Curated annotation (Swiss-Prot):
GO molecular function annotation: mannitol-1-phosphate 5-dehydrogenase activity
Lineage: Eukaryota, Fungi, Dikarya, Ascomycota, Pezizomycotina
Keywords: NAD, Oxidoreductase
Functional summary from the UniProt entry: Catalyzes the NAD(H)-dependent interconversion of D-fructose 6-phosphate and D-mannitol 1-phosphate in the mannitol metabolic pathway. Required for the process of sporulation on senescing leaf material.
Record's protein name: Mannitol-1-phosphate 5-dehydrogenase
Keyword Ribosomal protein: no
Binding, NAD(+): 7-18
A Gene Ontology biological process term: mannitol catabolic process
Its EC number(s): 1.1.1.17
Subunit note: Monomer.
Main EC class the enzyme belongs to: oxidoreductase
Amino acid sequence: MPYDKKAVHFGGGNIGRGFVAEFLHNSGYEVVFVDVMDSIIEALQKQSSYTVTEIGDDGEREFTIDHYRALNSKHEMDKVVQEIASADVVTCAVGPNILKFVAEPVAKAIDARTLDYPIAVIACENAINATTTWRGFIEGKLSEDSKSNLDKKARFANSAIDRIVPVQDKDAGLNVKIEKFYEWCVEQKPFENGGKKPDVKGIHYVDDLEPYIERKLFTVNTSHATAAYYGHQAKKQYIHEVLQDKKLHDIVRDAVKETAHLIVSKHGVSVQEQNDYVDSIIKRISNPVLKDNVERVGRAPLRKLSRKERFVGPAAQLAERGEKVDALLGAIEQAYLFQNVEGDEESAELAKILKENSAEEVVTKVNGLDKSHPLFEKILPIVKKVQGGS
């Protein structure tokens, strides 16, 4: 089947296959996967299709994803560049720390691009303004000619994505189980004045992305991670088990009550609307059908404890406003206790940092706060307590 639209997607993982590629495929795009994992690319090259199963309260729905191709960027970089140079859209779901490694092929493709409209560049990461970050890495590798007329060659749009992908069955192969709920918001201003807005069913284009990013990150990710870190200490296996425990359920609620206060006061969202949103999120992450593993949700604690992330991000803004942050501080303490968890490098690195640095150095290094910030003095005793093992 010939396609008149093409999207290149970096990252053949569950979010890439089960969310981004599903939407692109269902919107009539031929999808070209790019990854460095030999096993994923070989499987995609061998199999002509895979299944995405959406899990909801009302049961399951299956979708077949086909008519895709796959390239290994370790061995086929020239082909990757050619594909991007002739694509309508390039997306990624590789993890915020990997963005710098997927910049060069995009830069080379922009340099080589001869089409009379710009490619749309959209990062689909759990991070604020990830496309802007990716753009910085890409621009650092562009020719001077491309830099001088970049608007004609590429448009960069930040996005906010929200969809829970639970731990997959061991024998799932390429098939992905994913929750039915989704949100994919993309800023539309970058596509004005000569840009070509991707026609993707399910994307919600918005003028100002920040309220959507912060609402999602400081509600979904904050509640999810709070449940995971408290659940890990309570020896729970799944997130829904954490939330079935009334004491832990109330603790998670308290954390997102604090972030809700920020969302309402900063972005002008009504109290009722934010409360309804919080209720819907707690219901989502409480779904036992997802079998959402506590250790999976808790992994990468260093990133999750960083300055603009789900705990310190909202807590810092609230502290600057003189508002209450007690529940968020509790979650931060639990995150600091997520150390030396099997299969998670960051949890081992966190333990090392706590062992080798003073409490002041830890707060600066891990949380990105200097001593003058009002949150610094609130986190400092937590770190001292964790270091002391009390």
